[in-house]
């Protein structure tokens, strides 16, 4: 499938902005290991489920859950995952970050469940499974596509990241929403 042209309005238009919070859950383990693009997976709530599948952009902030102890859980592929609930994050990681989010079926991987995966456009020293992720979705980049190669998928994800970062950092009508999470 050919990537459609991305047309971004001058400011968020209905149904955006969408402001919500969700716990970070374990996903399939592909974002970091296979693609080199880590994601924070979240359950799909009714608000997100009402959106068309595709790629979205906005702002997010991680909130540690301090009343939870570390625990190990098993991912569907059998790998053990440490849920530290974000309690190991440093102060400089607990700020507002730009994000790009995929909602859909990931046809390249033939998922049987719809997934919401958020790539936070920052580097982190540790994982933060179990933390709460507060985020604001401000717009839509493109529909979900299928790919014939992993390289084509990665290339499109990197394009989504570049487009989203440019919008969030350079368009005042989008940049101003960062303050809602500070």
Swiss-Prot record:
A GO CC term attached to the entry: mitochondrion
Pathway, per record: Cofactor biosynthesis; FMN biosynthesis; FMN from riboflavin (ATP route): step 1/1
Enzyme class label: transferase
EC number assigned by the record: 2.7.1.26
GO-annotated molecular function: ATP binding; metal ion binding; riboflavin kinase activity
Cofactor(s) recorded in Swiss-Prot or TrEMBL: Zn(2+); Mg(2+)
Co-factor: note: Zinc or magnesium.
Keywords: ATP-binding, Flavoprotein, FMN, Kinase, Magnesium, Metal-binding, Nucleotide-binding, Transferase, Zinc
SMART domains, alphabetized: Flavokinase (SM00904)
Reactions this protein catalyses: riboflavin + ATP = FMN + ADP + H(+)
A biological process from GO: riboflavin biosynthetic process
Binding positions (Mg(2+)): 39, 41
Pfam families, per database record: Flavokinase
Active site: 117 (nucleophile)
Family stated for the protein in its record: Belongs to the flavokinase family.
Function: Catalyzes the phosphorylation of riboflavin (vitamin B2) to form flavin mononucleotide (FMN) coenzyme.
UniProt name for this protein: Riboflavin kinase
Naturally occurring in which organism (per UniProt): Lodderomyces elongisporus (strain ATCC 11503 / CBS 2605 / JCM 1781 / NBRC 1676 / NRRL YB-4239)
